[in-house]
Design a protein with these regions (language model features):
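Helix-turn-helix
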Residues: 5, 9-47
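Amphipathic alpha-helical segments used for helix-helix packing
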Residues: 87-111
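Short alpha-helical scaffolding segments that buttress acidic/His motifs in well-ordered protein cores
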Residues: 83, 97, 101, 138, ...
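Alpha-helical DNA-contacting segments of helix-turn-helix folds
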Residues: 47-56
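Hydrophobic/aromatic-rich alpha-helical bundle segments in the mid-to-C-terminal region
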Residues: 110-115, 119, 128-172
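Hydrophobic alpha-helical connector segments
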Residues: 51, 65-90
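A general structural signal for well-ordered alpha-helical segments in protein cores
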Residues: 45, 76, 80, 94-98, ...
Length: 172
């Protein structure tokens, strides 16, 4: 339970401060634990980042499926509506996972955590659409919204929603 609380605090700290800026001492303060406790659960700054990303991953998947309608077009539309809400509330600067990879491009553990997260999101969208053959195109729309959000905002979501509808209706 304490590990999860620390991971939740790390997620908030990295989301607000980025990955390069906060020192381990600042992260310790943000988590309201001793340095020993922090290192017991996350023995390096990279492990802290991975812990925060894994915590956020599960929170994100749960968030996408919250009050989800029946699978199919309605469910995918719901996912994109939830994506917009997530970006507005929790990720105004875009995808935290991609920001972590950009900050640590050569770190194998961070790269692996991000890759697993993205693959699970791709599979979820395919499953919810009832069109697993369209998992990758739908995922690319999802990622496009995340990337374009800081510049286009709601326009990115609206455009993706139009493409989702066309893609799912035209390929039936």
């Amino acid at each position: 339970m304490l590990r999860e609380q620390i991971a939740a605090s790390l997620e908030v700290a990295f989301s607000q401060q980025g990955f390069a800026e906060p020192s381990v001492a600042q992260l310790k303060t943000a988590c309201d634990v001793s340095l020993r406790t922090l290192y017991k659960h996350f023995p390096s700054k990279e492990a802290m980042i991975v812990g925060a990303l894994e915590y956020r991953h599960q929170r994100y998947l749960d968030f996408l499926l919250e009050t989800s309608p029946e699978k199919g077009l309605a469910s995918v539309t719901h996912i994109f509506n939830k994506l917009q809400q997530w970006l507005e509330e929790y990720a105004p600067h875009g995808c935290m996972s991609m920001n972590a990879m950009a900050a640590f491009p050569d770190n194998e553990f961070i790269s692996q955590a991000v890759t697993q997260h993205k693959e699970q999101v791709r599979l979820l969208i395919g499953k919810q659409s009832l069109r697993e053959d369209l998992a990758t195109p739908l995922f690319l729309l999802h990622e496009g919204v995340s990337s374009a959000w800081p510049v286009l905002g709601e326009e990115a979501v609206a455009s993706a929603q139009n493409m989702v509808t066309k893609l799912l209706k035209e390929t039936v």
